[in-house]
Amino acid sequence: MTTQESIKPLVDRILSNPLQFNAAMISNKSNNNDTSAAPENSSYIVIGKQHNNNSNSTAIAATAESKQIKENNLIDRPNGKKTNTVPKSMAEALLLYTSKNDKDAADATGAKKSAELSTELSTEPPSSSSEDDKVGKEEEEEGEIFHEARDYVEPRKASLKERDNADKGDGEDIGEDIGEDIGEDIGEDIGEDIGENLGSPLATIDDSSNENEKEKRKELSTSISSDDEIEDDEDEDDMDYDSSAMEKELPEEEENDSSSKISEGEKKSLYQDLMENSTVEVNRYEPVNNTKENGNRNPKGEEEEEEEEELKHKSRSITPPVTISNLSNFYQFNENINDRGSLNSTRIVKNWGDKFTNLKPRGLLNHGVTCYTNAAVQAMLHIPSIQHYLFDILMGKYDSTISKNSVSYTLAETSKKMWLPVSKNPRKNVSASYINPKHLISRLDDINCMMSEWQQEDSHEYFMSLMSRLQEDSVPKGHKLIESIIYDIFGGLLKQIVTCKSCGSISKTEQPFYDLSLHLKGKKKLDPNSDLSSDSINGTSATTSTTTSNAATKPSLSSSSSVNLNNGSPFAAASDLSSANRRFSIEKSIKDFFNPELIKVDKEQKGYVCEKCHKTTNAVKHSSILRAPETLLVHLKKFRFNGTSSSKMKQAVSYPMFLDLTEYCESKELPVKYQLLSVVVHEGRSLSSGHYIAHCKQPDGSWATYDDEYINIISERDVLKEPNAYYLLYTRLTPKSVPLPLAKSAMATGNVTSKSKQEQAVNEPNNRPLKINSKKNNRKKWKKNKKRKFTK
């Protein structure tokens, strides 16, 4: 018996280590802490200290006897002081921490189940030792007892229901839950239930230490919780942040990011401006949430989405779209060599022919800042009728009107070098990539004396000046400019009807035009008494609408060179286009121009002056097309002038591949539909800086980008997505109902001879046609000398 009595304390110490750990805290805790402290806090810290200090088996036995006495006292006195309640194990401490309303019942239940729980916990000595180490560290860092208890006994949501049932009497499975989850899931439960189940017992702690304890709990919960819980919490925090950040960012996005808002609205309809605001506000939240949830999105994906949006917008047309069935009623690009247009002109050829189809033009050398001339020349020489006309000049068809010193002849020689096929002889072969247009650049003073080859100029102004010079060279002296072949290619006729609101008189005018100028933004305002800086329309005339007026330099085109599609005002545009980032549709501006417009009298008594009643009054103006040009030049006014300086409007532009103007024509007998031929692009911030390039359609139907000396293949889709277009060239599609001019045999033979001469001019590398011209000149001189001899 003596041996058993001596071994029994050792066995009890090993088997009931958690019990001795808790019992030792009583004496230490009763000496150090106040009676007002929470029982679970005092008992828990005492357990840790007593376990570290006790080494005698007799002390362990004494503590066991004292615990039994205190348990009986607690059962007999349910309303006794809470400082006397001593948990027997970690599970009993759990019950004390998680129960608020029925703490006495929890104490009684814990006393009854202490033996079972202690045996279950004692079978895991590593966990108890790790608990002791953690408790010791926590005591050094923080003097509060409840902090260490939270570190280990935080419940999870799944076990809370079991613990509530344990308070009512179903506490049998608590020990199993603790043994399974004490080292795995307690940390997960801390982050979830810190504000749900532990808030009520925390209210009994001193107010001075509540804030510090809450901060420590958050730190411990984040350090103990598993990776999955951390990710879930971060996702929840991100979602909360998204909702708050989105509310703060939305007002700024509504002011600054108008491009996305407008692009969404225009997808619905360009005319439904009132519906835009409602639809955009709903759709704006989707990209914000997607960017927040997905984190950093792929920039390539964003670019592709933007490109798709731009393409969808650009493919839309306010005017009736040209469908495949409609296109079958027209001669397609380069389909019939005998296609001479819808105006029955016998002087123009609208298709390239078989010989040009196999040729590739060359680039043009940049002399420093001559990209504006190169882009304009490339756009003009990719018009089939212009190129055929220039080759006819080289073959001497227009020797009676065009001299060799003219700008037209210089341009013809430049075009010949551009289209010259590559020779098999390397000595005679020129550069296969580009040519030097030095002779054409040297004639810049004759084209426009206000321009300089050492300074960046306006490419559209150069194009119009070159067109004007070609028209002047092609008309004999004493003849009208509308008799020129240039008028057959670019010329149109506009009819304007102005009705006086005072007397009801109607004024009708007809004016030729060579391009259509579109403003991109501003208010509609008509000033008929303005000078040449604005586009005046007083019922009898219209000035030019190029970027800088051609009235001073080219009087031949100053009276009727172009039509301002913003109704005569430099500030006119669609009222909806107030944002600089809003995409501009040329179809909408054309429609706005041809709609009836009210000309109002302003405060300065400026308005329409009636020729009949001689009053300055209100009037209604209506415009229509009498003659649609074979080649339509659309100019976009992207530059504004403030005295001596200019600025560029950052306005994205959309334009269709096919443009329908039938509804704006006076006669509806023939449909008026156009196909895109060339796009000249300006890249830069101002008129005096930047760079010009040209997207042109090749004779074989493909598209190419001409960047001075460099030529790159480009797709038709990329051409339509170009946001920096400055001016565009459209060619009119000839309906198949129009008879082709093949009736007379003389015309047919003339066409064959002219075609053979053009092929000869292209194929022969050097000036063989010039030798023929020199022989003719020698014959003329010989005839003159012969006449002089006979007269003598």
Swiss-Prot record:
GO biological process: protein deubiquitination; proteolysis; regulation of protein stability; subtelomeric heterochromatin formation
Basic and acidic residues biased stretches: 144-171, 211-220
Keyword Cell inner membrane among record annotations: no
Segments forming domain USP: 362-733
Region (Disordered): 64-87, 103-320, 526-563, 749-792
Region: UTP22-binding module, residue numbers: 167-208
Record field: compositional bias (Basic residues): 773-792
Ranges for region SIR4-binding module: 109-145
GO CC aspect terms: chromosome, telomeric region; cytosol; nuclear replication fork; nucleolus; nucleus
Catalytic activity: Thiol-dependent hydrolysis of ester, thioester, amide, peptide and isopeptide bonds formed by the C-terminal Gly of ubiquitin (a 76-residue protein attached to proteins as an intracellular targeting signal)
Keywords, sorted A to Z: Chromosome, Hydrolase, Nucleus, Protease, Telomere, Thiol protease, Ubl conjugation pathway
Catalytic residues, chain numbering: C371 (nucleophile), H691 (proton acceptor)
Domain of life of the source: Eukaryota
Bias type Acidic residues, positions: 172-195, 226-241
Pfam families for the chain: UCH
Record-linked InterPro entries: Papain-like_cys_pep_sf (IPR038765), Peptidase_C19 (IPR050164), Peptidase_C19_UCH (IPR001394), USP_CS (IPR018200), USP_dom (IPR028889)
EC number: 3.4.19.12
Compositional bias of kind Polar residues: 288-297, 530-539, 749-766
UniProt free text on domains: Residues 2-27 within the N-terminal intrinsically disordered regions (IDR) constitute the binding module for DHR2 which is required to coordinate the UBP10-DHR2 interaction. Residues 109-145 within the N-terminal intrinsically disordered regions (IDR) constitute the binding module for SIR4 which required to coordinate the UBP10-SIR4 interaction, but also to direct UBP10's functional role in telomere chromatin silencing.
Protein's job: Deubiquitinating enzyme involved in telomere and HM loci silencing, which is the repression of chromatin structure which leads to a stop in the transcription of nearby genes. Targets histone H2B for deubiquitination, thus helping to localize SIR2 to the telomere. At silent chromatin, including telomeres and the rDNA locus, not only maintains low H2B 'Lys-123' ubiquitination (H2BK123Ub), but also low H3 'Lys-4' and 'Lys-79' methylation (H3K4me and H3K79me, respectively).
Subunit and interaction comment: Interacts with SIR4. Interacts with the proliferating-cell nuclear antigen PCNA/POL30. Interacts with DHR2 and UTP22.
Family: Belongs to the peptidase C19 family.
Name of the molecule in the record: Ubiquitin carboxyl-terminal hydrolase 10
Organism: Saccharomyces cerevisiae (strain ATCC 204508 / S288c)
Gene coding for it: UBP10
